[in-house]
Amino acid sequence: MIPQLVDQVPEVEIGYLLAKEYWGQGLATEAAHASRDYGFKIGYGRLISLIDPGNIASQKVALKTGLCCEKDTIYVGKTVRVYAIAANESC
């Protein structure tokens, strides 16, 4: 869980980073699911992921985790795609 300020709005981001040799094994999806569940358990009402628009694998992880693509925005000088989920909601 990483606190972020996106378009002047405080958000909490689900983040993960895996070494290349672990890609394609479902580990990022498993980590994202666990992070999502834990975030909601401790009381966060909304979680996001900020993803490079060219990172198709991470976008798939976000979708598998139930996050919806909301928008593209500029974050720290780079274009990112914002995926989000609210507690007890789906796309």
Question: Which residue stretches match the model-derived regions?
Answer:
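Acyl-donor (CoA/ACP) binding surface of acyl/acetyltransferases
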Residues: 1-91
